């Protein structure tokens, strides 16, 4: 199993942390370039949140 890269994100609590996304996908309108989205879990509150991933992130 390959290790996913850590991404620097701002959590809903306002802190900036390096987290690994639990799930990634591409969100794209029909016929256009999309953006990569990651699902992260806040380590403090346990809440899930979404954040944009860099374009070079493997999906």
Swiss-Prot record:
Keyword set includes Cytoplasm: yes
GO cellular component terms given for this protein: chromosome; cytoplasm
Post-translational modification: Methylated at multiple sites, to varying extents.
One annotated GO molecular function: double-stranded DNA binding
Location (main, coarse): cytoplasm
Lipoprotein keyword on record: no
Intracellular or extracellular location(s): Chromosome; Cytoplasm
InterPro entries assigned to the protein according to its UniProt record, in alphabetical order: Cren7_sf, dsDNA-bd_Cren7
Domain of life: Archaea
Xref: Pfam families: Cren7
Keywords assigned: Chromosome, Cytoplasm, DNA-binding, Methylation
Annotated Gene3D superfamilies: Chromatin protein Cren7
Subunit text: Monomer.
Similarity comment text for this entry: Belongs to the Cren7 family.
Annotated function: A chromatin protein, binds double-stranded DNA without sequence specificity. Constrains negative DNA supercoils.
Protein name: Chromatin protein Cren7
Species whose genome carries this gene: Sulfolobus acidocaldarius (strain ATCC 33909 / DSM 639 / JCM 8929 / NBRC 15157 / NCIMB 11770)
Gene name of the encoded protein: creN7
